[in-house]
From Swiss-Prot:
<protein>
    <recommendedName>
        <fullName>Aspartate carbamoyltransferase catalytic subunit</fullName>
        <ecNumber>2.1.3.2</ecNumber>
    </recommendedName>
</protein>
<dbReference type="GO" id="GO:0005829">
    <property type="term" value="C:cytosol"/>
</dbReference>
<comment type="function">
    <text>Catalyzes the condensation of carbamoyl phosphate and aspartate to form carbamoyl aspartate and inorganic phosphate, the committed step in the de novo pyrimidine nucleotide biosynthesis pathway.</text>
</comment>
<feature type="binding site">
    <location>
        <position position="168"/>
    </location>
    <ligand>
        <name>L-aspartate</name>
    </ligand>
</feature>
<comment type="subunit">
    <text>Heterododecamer (2C3:3R2) of six catalytic PyrB chains organized as two trimers (C3), and six regulatory PyrI chains organized as three dimers (R2).</text>
</comment>
<feature type="binding site">
    <location>
        <position position="230"/>
    </location>
    <ligand>
        <name>L-aspartate</name>
    </ligand>
</feature>
<dbReference type="InterPro" id="IPR002082">
    <property type="entry name" value="Asp_carbamoyltransf"/>
</dbReference>
<dbReference type="InterPro" id="IPR036901">
    <property type="entry name" value="Asp/Orn_carbamoylTrfase_sf"/>
</dbReference>
<dbReference type="Pfam" id="PF02729">
    <property type="entry name" value="OTCace_N"/>
</dbReference>
<dbReference type="Pfam" id="PF00185">
    <property type="entry name" value="OTCace"/>
</dbReference>
<feature type="binding site">
    <location>
        <position position="268"/>
    </location>
    <ligand>
        <name>carbamoyl phosphate</name>
    </ligand>
</feature>
<keyword id="KW-0808">Transferase</keyword>
<feature type="binding site">
    <location>
        <position position="85"/>
    </location>
    <ligand>
        <name>L-aspartate</name>
    </ligand>
</feature>
<dbReference type="InterPro" id="IPR006131">
    <property type="entry name" value="Asp_carbamoyltransf_Asp/Orn-bd"/>
</dbReference>
<keyword id="KW-0665">Pyrimidine biosynthesis</keyword>
<feature type="binding site">
    <location>
        <position position="138"/>
    </location>
    <ligand>
        <name>carbamoyl phosphate</name>
    </ligand>
</feature>
<feature type="binding site">
    <location>
        <position position="106"/>
    </location>
    <ligand>
        <name>carbamoyl phosphate</name>
    </ligand>
</feature>
Amino acid sequence: MVNPLYQKHIISINDLSREDLELTLRVAASLKAKPQPELLKHKVIASCFFEASTRTRLSFETAMHRLGASVVGFADSNNTSLGKKGETLADTISVISQYVDAIVMRHPQEGASRLATEFSGGIPVLNAGDGANQHPTQTLLDLFTIQETQGRLNNINIAMVGDLKYGRTVHSLTQALAKFEGNRFYFIAPDALAMPDYILSMLKEKNIAYSLHNSIDEVVGELDILYMTRVQKERLDPSEYINIKSQFVLRAADLHSARPNLKVLHPLPRVDEITIDVDATPYAYYFQQAGNGIYARQALLALVLNRELVL
């Protein structure tokens, strides 16, 4: 049977059904347990990063190499015809699609990856982040990590902390977890960076429980997952930032009433919002979370590029 993700563009987490998510996570677990170094042996994948990236680019390219694919591309668009000679994004994608079997793309402009699908000639485009819009593979690795640490994706108590207004990771993760039963959300953010109304409306429509809070202390004893994010200094007045920054910092002492199964996650990079002493606690899992990006991205590449995937 042809797998449902074969030759599919992956631009938004909403492009994936619950069944698609579960399939991808099963494949990720299989690839983590049993590497397949020749699965994409005869494939060529373009890694096109039009803006800076550390974790996403390196984990995607590691995923490609570990599956046996050949990798071409760039990490600085200023050294391409688009950056040097004024070539349009449409023309750049039209040309790249002549050379490769799939395109992994990050771009600072919202909607750029969706636009790329119109000019890729049917070559699948995988969104590695487009501005503040979508970052579906981050959501996949977050889901994989939650399932790995909790053994399930339903009946999860999850708190999201920090910049919930502009942080694309928390929007996508909330939308993805809303596909599973019994999850409860705790949103901890200043009013200026609160979760957008469209996310709250979606949860209300689905009759999914959520609550708004002012501090981590209020809920830490109820949580399975504590998902920290960086408060973005550039979004706030300096005086407001100083106040908010100190309010939303996680220290090891804050975890004294945590459940034994709690895991602290963060999409990284962190700045000051998780102190170093948390790293040594059994709750810290953000570096392992970053490592899981390899397996989540391997799974997506394997599914998109294999008509009938047998592992």
